Swiss-Prot record:
A Pfam family this chain is assigned to: UPF0561
Protein name as catalogued: UPF0561 protein C2orf68 homolog
Biased composition (Basic residues): 50-64
Region Disordered, annotated ranges: 1-98
Sequence intervals crossing the membrane: none
Entry's family note: Belongs to the UPF0561 family.
Origin species: Danio rerio
Ranges annotated as biased composition (Basic and acidic residues): 1-13, 35-49
Endpoints of the signal sequence: none
Listed PANTHER family: UPF0561 PROTEIN C2ORF68
Amino acid sequence: MEVIRDGEGESVKYKPGGRLDMSHGFLRHIRRNQIARDDYDREVKQAKEKQRRRHTNTPRRPRRPDRQVYNPRIRNGSEPGVNAEAEDWNESSSGTEMENTGTELFWLDYQADNGKITSFIVHKEDKPEVIVQRVAEKNVLDSSMRAALLARVGQEMNKRCDKR
């Protein structure tokens, strides 16, 4: 609205049919931004619905894990390199680890003073004395350390055997 003043400034008159001057175009930019925002929101909503509708009848992964199947080694002499590598691998692993295939209770990680870490899997059927002996073979342990390790391993085994 425009205000018209008289020369003296006492009487104030309003221009008839007063409206906002929209020639600056400011609201046009606001409306354009609102329309762009609405279009974007609509696209995002449609994408989410499309993603929700993609459910298939088959599950993504099998309900039961695949069974492990024993595949025997082929012992024909045609591939000596492959068989030799497999035999070397079997020889390099220690026999004590292969003997104990019972119920696994926990991993035993022993860190020596020099920072070397020795790891063993402790099984339900293992005896704490045997485990301490295996750790002592790979690390230098005095009698007090052996006794402390024996007590701790026995305590952990009893705690985990009671839970199972």
